[in-house]
Amino acid sequence: TGNDYVGGIAGSMGTASVAGLLNTTLGVASYLAFTVDNVHVNGAENGFTITGNERVAGGFGDTIGGSITTVSINNLASIEGNNLVGGFIGLSGPGDLAGADGGLTVNLLGLNYLLKLNNLLSLGQAIEVKIKDTNVNGINDGFTVHAKGSRDSNSVRDYSASGFIAKSGSTKVEDSHVTNLKSVKATDDGGYASGFVAISKTGGLADVADDSSIKSLIEANGLVNAVGYLIPKYTNCTVSFVNGGSVTADVAGGFAADFQSGTVDNSSRGTNDYYAV
């Protein structure tokens, strides 16, 4: 139980000294990505619950710039929060990090003075999250995910909940699965709910900083090499529901709700087993 950034493994994981991604000597080429390898969370037979406000998940509340390999969340019973609620990750990638809602800020001010254009590729690598061989397994009766937040009058804010990642930008997921999912719920006004990823979008520098000089630099020189690092990708990823499973929200889907960007490729499973749900 906590407020923001709540996870069964860690509340927030990111590149070391995120504000130091820009260095007067090394540019953005110098960064230290986080690594999580062979970590397992096992609940009791009747499961465990996680509650919080925003960025609440069975594994990590928030991740940016690193790799996660061979991780499992077992006997999960329920996850509940106001927004960005996920079975494994609440927010993955840059997402809303530059927002004024208490999120992390990647400091790219002065980019036009410090950044060498050939280091744009490194920036893409610095914010990318790679996930492999990771599973979220609910209790026998199934686990529930609920984003309780709702829009105030005149608000356009989105609320997301999902069995794996609530909001994904610049995330590459491979050989990862959700099992024994019972229900996923979000508000019927601006709510996004799904079995695997609620909102999938391309992470970009516009999400990281809003300085006009940065945008003009990007527009003039392009991000051709870095773009590949910013597009989400889901390879051999599946979700399975218990009998009577459900997804309820303004925008809802068995695998994804709002799939703005990304690719899904389950072809390695064979023609009889390549369905994601």
What does each model-identified segment do?
Residues 1-277:
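Surface-exposed loop/turn motifs in large extracellular/passenger domains
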